[in-house]
Amino acid sequence: MTHPDVIKRAIGAAAIGNITEWYDFGVYSYMALTIGDVIMPLEGSAATLMTYALMAVAFLFRPLGGIILGPLSDRIGRNKVLAMTMIMMAGATVAIGLIPDYAHAGIWACVLLFLCRVLQGFSTGGEYGNAMTFIAEYAPDKKRGFLGSLLEVGTFTGYLLGAGMSALVMALCTTDQLHSWGWRLPFFLALPLGFIGVYLRSKLGDTPAFEALEAESEQREKDNKVSLKDTFKMWPAMLVCGGLVIAWNVTNYMLTAYMPSFLSTVTDHKGGQGISDNMNNVSQIIVMAVCLAIIPLIGLASDRIGRKTIVRIGSVMLIVLAFPSLMLITRNTEGSVIAGLIIMGLSLICFSATMPSTLPSLFPTAVRAGALSIAFNIFISAFCGTTALYTGALVDATGNLMWPAYILIIAGVIGLVSVHFLPESNGRPLWGSAPSVEHDHEAHGVVKDLHAEADQLKAAGVREDAPYEEADEVLAKS
């Protein structure tokens, strides 16, 4: 049984990394044009394109971070690696604000920006899967959906904070001030976020599941030598994880990364008539705020009706509502754009609210952080991080403004197929972990239920380390 105060601190410690990551994403996205003008030796659209290319660089290094830092978390502990990623992430973000402009540093300005993005990508590769694992292992079984959803509250909070700070600086600075020093200010806010994150993470012990695993064997150091091999033995679960990651994050980056530039494309197609750039930014902030408010409610619902049900609803919404949402967005009026983006956002948060509790349940404790980090980052880098790039290329090449809808439908189909193979983890212990409860009276009920289920499974000849699917099939027939 984990004390509620400890759980609250664990959630705060995990969420602060997400806030920092998405704060940087929001700031970099909003400041991309200015960064291109100041740091790149190119002009106009070429400088902007290069700036976005450097944004994509971070995705190329996320799998490397997942491969190295994920298994390291299974070896030395979740909280130690989370402290490391917090330092790297915040340090790289602050460093971007310190890069000299091209007029003073020449090509080295571009090189320094590249290196900062590499470090951000590497650290993020070890951050998110580990943070999901951290919260999932701390959370009581019957509240894991709600508490896991708070990790995504951190995501949307970070994006809103980054967008808001960038918009504030742009509003208060003249063009010359913005190009001289104003663009740097939002990046410096990552410094206090980093201090807070490291402090929170250093004050917590490791998760009960990891500590129990460590106590099981004096041969743990020897076992760690084959941990990466053992991790890849989980490839069926990693494929299910990858399918869910695609459905989730194609939608995520379609909304947060591509829609702002897509609205400008729609305006061009309509001969310059449509919402202003300022309203474009405001509409994104409104949608993020709406999603932020609803995410915990969906997480709470997933503890009542199951994760699979929520994920299935989100997948169906992508398939059925992709065209209606794009039709509203392409009308390009203030009300229609916000309505269309909110529809897309509601589809997104069916995944965002449930994935932090769903994905860790696919893997046993010994390889959980490693398998999750590797699968998550490989699939997000290969299929999701470039969503804006390939969607924009298809729209530009064909002139068809409905391409985002086609891609969202494909994402929904992938999600629907993946959820078919997803075991329901609602209210159950994580694979390889003891039951986690919040109160003593709950513990007595859990023990009674587990004894009854264990007797049924033993009678059916199901082994103790069998995956959920095998146990589910036996229990469903009884």
Per-range role (PLM):
Residues 146-170, 193, 375-387:
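Glycine-rich segments within core transmembrane alpha-helices of 12-TM secondary carriers
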Residues 87-106, 316-332:
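C-terminal ends and interior cores of transmembrane alpha-helices
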Residues 66-77, 294-307:
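Helix-to-loop junctions at the C-terminal end of transmembrane segments
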Residues 29, 235-291, 383-388:
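Extracytoplasmic gate region of multi-pass secondary transporters
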Residues 365-397:
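A late C-terminal transmembrane helix in Major Facilitator Superfamily
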Residues 309-354:
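C-terminal transmembrane helical hairpin of 12-TM major facilitator-type secondary transporters
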